[in-house]
Each structure stands twice: as C-alpha cells, then as structure tokens.
C-alpha cells in the first residue's frame, strides 16, 4: 500500500497545482487580446518576409551552382 501512495503522490500534487493555476488565471480583456494578436501577426509577417528574402537570395545561387 505504501508503494501505491508513493507512486500516486506526484500525480496528485501535479493535479492539485494545475487546478490552482487554472483557478488563478484570468481571461484577457479586449485591449490585451488585441495587443497580443497584433504582436503575433507582426511576428508572423516578419518571419514570412525573412523566409521570402532568404529564398529569393538562394534561388539565383542555386541556379548558378546547379546550372554549371
């Protein structure tokens, strides 16, 4: 029985901490949500442009290497 309690204790502590975290969290208000959404969109756009320019630079380099 002692082994069962010893085995189940980490799971029980994790569940207890998780429930406490969920109860403490709050939903973002409209302004905060918009700020997060805009920051995420800007990040996606920047990463997209970086990928586009890297691809744009590597296409001619690849054609030079493969073309010869």
UniProtKB/Swiss-Prot annotation:
Give the UniProt family note. Answer: Belongs to the SecE/SEC61-gamma family.
List residues in topological domain: Cytoplasmic.
1-32
Q: Which GO terms describe its molecular function?
A: protein transmembrane transporter activity
An individual GO BP term: SRP-dependent cotranslational protein targeting to membrane, translocation
Query: Chief location of this protein?
Result: endoplasmic reticulum
Domain of life from the UniProt record: Eukaryota
Its signal peptide is none
Pfam (any one): SecE
SUPFAM superfamilies, from UniProt?
Preprotein translocase SecE subunit (SSF103456)
Membrane protein topology class: Single-pass membrane protein
Per UniProt, subunit arrangement is: Heterotrimeric complex composed of SEC61-alpha, SEC61-beta and SEC61-gamma.
Q: Which residues cross the membrane?
A: 33-61
- PANTHER family according to UniProt: SEC61 GAMMA SUBUNIT (PTHR12309)
Compartment(s) of residence:
Endoplasmic reticulum membrane
Keyword Transport listed? The answer is yes
Looking up NCBIfam families in the UniProt record yields: secE_euk_arch (TIGR00327)
Q: What is the lineage of its organism?
A: Eukaryota, Metazoa, Ecdysozoa, Arthropoda, Hexapoda
What's this protein's function? Necessary for protein translocation in the endoplasmic reticulum.
Protein's name according to its UniProt entry:
Protein transport protein Sec61 gamma-1 subunit
